[in-house]
Structure formats: structure tokens, C-alpha cells
């Protein structure tokens, strides 16, 4: 099974993350940030990846450290669970609607971390959650998962819907990209014979 557990402890956060890439989309998430928990639950459900996140952070300061560090740990867990990436589909893209919002998410599990994030929010906050932290999370996740990730909201008016379409779009793209391609016969999907270099 393609699983991994990452523990990360700093002076700002104490985080434990587990993933099962071949799961059923089960989630057990507690970060102390309600909206963020909701996004991570959506990520698990729509990716089919089982995700457990337990985080204690300096929420008395703000949500930044917890959000970013969960992205770091979750990215590291996905990378570890992928192993040598043999047999994976590698590329995937999706257009994800959420009511009036449409976002496009395209992924390459390349071993080369890049984030292109073209998303604008009409509001600074969703409840108590700073919308600028959505990009911070995607940046931390992409860099530590070692993936090339393009996220663009084509249009949308509601900040909650925009964020949700981005997380769900990532989920559906991940679901397809990490899937084992039966035609690959276990080969690494690269003419170089390896990914990440």
C-alpha cells in the first residue's frame, strides 16, 4: 500500500499527517481552523486519498503557521507515499465548477516543484480565515510534494466557492495523477526512466 506518515514539530506548530493514496477518501482532520478543516475534508473525499491531520499551532498569533506547515507535512507525506512513482498516470487536469465559480487545476507529478496560482478573492476573509492563506497552502503543498501545479480560477464571485473549487480541483487532479496506469506495466512515466531530475 502507498502510505506515509509525517510528523513535524517546530516552536510554532506540532503536526502529524498520514495518507493512504489507495484509500476511500476518509478523513480525520483537526487543525483548530474550521474552514481549513473543511477544505482538507473535501481534499480527502474527492481525491480518494485517506487523510489524517492532527495539528496544534500558535492560533493565538494567526492561522498562517498552521496552514503553511500542514501544507508542508501533507506534501511530504504524498511524496513519500508515491515512492519511485513507478506506474503512476503522472499528468491530470480538471475543470471544477462550484456554483458560479469555475477553476482549472492541472498537475504533473514530475519531481520538479512549481506552483502557478492565478486566483483572486473578492474578500480578504472567509469567516476568520485569511484568503491569502489559500495560496500559502498550495505553495507549501506543491513544493514539498515535488509536483508541478497550475491553479487558475477562470471566474467566480464568492470567496468560499473559489477556495472550494481550487481544493476540489486539486483533489480530482490528484486522484487521476496518482492512479496506477495499467498500461504502464510498472514503468516510471518518463523517457529518462526517472522523475525528479
UniProtKB/Swiss-Prot annotation:
Catalyzed reactions per annotation: D-erythro-1-(imidazol-4-yl)glycerol 3-phosphate = 3-(imidazol-4-yl)-2-oxopropyl phosphate + H2O
One of the record's GO cellular component terms: cytoplasm
Pathway: Amino-acid biosynthesis; L-histidine biosynthesis; L-histidine from 5-phospho-alpha-D-ribose 1-diphosphate: step 6/9
Molecular-function GO term, any one: imidazoleglycerol-phosphate dehydratase activity
Intracellular or extracellular location(s): Cytoplasm
Database matches in InterPro entries: IGPD_sf (IPR038494), ImidazoleglycerolP_deHydtase (IPR000807), ImidazoleglycerP_deHydtase_CS (IPR020565), Ribosomal_Su5_D2-typ_SF (IPR020568)
Protein origin, superkingdom: Bacteria
Major location (coarse): cytoplasm
Entry keyword set: Amino-acid biosynthesis, Cytoplasm, Histidine biosynthesis, Lyase
EC number: 4.2.1.19
One GO biological process term: L-histidine biosynthetic process
Enzyme superclass (EC): lyase
Tagged with keyword Transcription regulation: no
HAMAP family in the record: HisB
Sequence similarity: Belongs to the imidazoleglycerol-phosphate dehydratase family.
Protein name listed in UniProt: Imidazoleglycerol-phosphate dehydratase
